[in-house]
């Protein structure tokens, strides 16, 4: 939902908030600030997780790069469908009128990744050499969870930047407040302070209601959470792969619960608490699975027997022949 009345007297807010159009190509094609911020969020996230894959996890980053060409359309489609479902958009193809819900984008992006990465990581050129506990050189297929840990938390970068696009569009407002309570905002960010005012006409007077800058709180919290789970959790050696990516869903649910309860009633959507609850539960169950259950399953003889029945390791090793050096053992496993 957007505010339609912008301060008619403040040139500051008109320059920053009311001008949703960054520039125009020709006379009819406008490029909006929201779109520019959206693209910048994507690019920064891509750069971040590519560096993470290359220098931290030391696995090929090409699969993550190629995933972009699947993730972008799937994310946009998912976000658009979700906006239609919650009533924030009326026409699927009218992208220029807004309506991209992050929940739908996240779900669509994760589902497409769950199909894409297991397939592409089977390709021998993406397998890596490593040293096992006995000092033997082995060839390993990187786990899909490594890419999940590198990529999924960077969604927070896009969310943090995207909230500023919401600000320019006149979206994401908190509860009603007072000028006195927001003096800190007036001093620190005058344009944001003015942008939180909703002007209306009552009789012969021009009045305004001022709202809490909820977009700013959520943007700041997203940055804090990103730094914590992306860098802080990496120093806890006891955590299994996949825990970091599952932490995103947990903290996302917590963040949305906190911010949705602080929204002004006219800017809330029905059903938001349900999907936030599901994402939070998914994060908790997923973290428990990758930390405790998955390691146990990998040690079970029965599971190994089932894998052997449906997946012929000898055939796979035969395909790896060109990768092996004379002194190397060839072994298929997950890192």
Swiss-Prot record:
Molecular function (GO) terms listed? phosphatidylglycerol-prolipoprotein diacylglyceryl transferase activity
Write down the top EC class of this protein. Answer: transferase
Which pathway?
Protein modification; lipoprotein biosynthesis (diacylglyceryl transfer)
Q: Name one Pfam family in it.
A: LGT
The record's keywords, sorted A to Z, are:
Cell membrane, Membrane, Transferase, Transmembrane, Transmembrane helix
What is the E.C. number? 2.5.1.145
Location(s) in or outside the cell: Cell membrane
What membrane topology term does the record carry? Multi-pass membrane protein
GO CC annotations on file = plasma membrane
The answer to whether keyword Membrane applies is: yes
Binding, a 1,2-diacyl-sn-glycero-3-phospho-(1'-sn-glycerol): 163
Could you name the domain of life of the organism this protein comes from?
Answer: Bacteria
Annotated membrane-spanning segments are 31-51, 67-87, 100-120, 213-233, 235-255, 277-297
Q: Name one GO biological process term.
A: lipoprotein biosynthetic process
- Protein function: Catalyzes the transfer of the diacylglyceryl group from phosphatidylglycerol to the sulfhydryl group of the N-terminal cysteine of a prolipoprotein, the first step in the formation of mature lipoproteins.
Q: Please give the NCBIfam families that the UniProt record associates with this protein.
A: lgt
Family designation: Belongs to the Lgt family.
Q: What is this protein called?
A: Phosphatidylglycerol--prolipoprotein diacylglyceryl transferase
Give the organism, scientific name: Ureaplasma parvum serovar 3 (strain ATCC 700970)
The lineage is: Bacteria, Bacillati, Mycoplasmatota, Mycoplasmoidales, Mycoplasmoidaceae
Q: Could you tell me the gene encoding this protein?
A: lgt
């Amino acid at each position: 939902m957007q505010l339609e009345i912008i301060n008619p007297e403040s040139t500051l807010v008109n320059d920053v908030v009311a001008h949703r159009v960054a520039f125009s190509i020709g006379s009819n094609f406008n490029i909006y600030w929201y779109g520019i911020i959206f693209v910048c969020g994507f690019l920064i996230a891509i750069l971040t997780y590519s560096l993470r894959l290359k220098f931290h996890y030391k696995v090929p980053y090409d699969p993550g790069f190629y995933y972009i060409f699947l993730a972008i359309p799937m994310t946009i489609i998912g976000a658009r469908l979700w906006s239609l479902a919650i009533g924030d958009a009326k026409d699927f193809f009218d992208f220029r009128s807004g309506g991209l819900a992050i929940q739908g984008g996240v779900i669509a992006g994760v589902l497409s990744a769950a199909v894409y990465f297991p397939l592409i990581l089977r390709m021998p050129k993406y397998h890596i050499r490593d040293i096992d506990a006995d000092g033997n050189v082995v060839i390993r297929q990187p786990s899909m969870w490594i890419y999940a840990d590198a990529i999924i938390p960077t969604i927070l970068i896009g969310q943090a930047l995207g909230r500023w696009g919401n600000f320019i569009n006149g979206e994401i407002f908190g509860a009603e407040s007072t000028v006195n309570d927001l003096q800190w905002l007036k001093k620190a960010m005058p344009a944001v302070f003015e942008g939180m005012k909703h002007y209306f006409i009552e009789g012969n007077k021009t009045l305004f209601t001022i709202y809490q800058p909820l977009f700013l709180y959520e943007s700041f919290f997203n940055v804090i959470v990103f730094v914590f789970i992306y860098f802080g959790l990496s120093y806890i050696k006891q955590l299994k792969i996949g825990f970091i990516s599952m932490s995103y869903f947990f903290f996302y649910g917590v963040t949305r619960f906190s911010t949705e309860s602080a929204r002004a009633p006219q800017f809330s959507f029905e059903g938001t608490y349900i999907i936030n609850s599901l994402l939070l539960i998914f994060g908790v169950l997923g973290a428990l699975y990758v930390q405790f259950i998955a390691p146990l399953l990998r040690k079970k003889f029965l599971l190994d027997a089932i894998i052997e029945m449906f997946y012929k390791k000898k055939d796979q090793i035969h395909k790896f022949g060109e990768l092996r050096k004379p002194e190397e053992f060839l072994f298929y496993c997950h890192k």
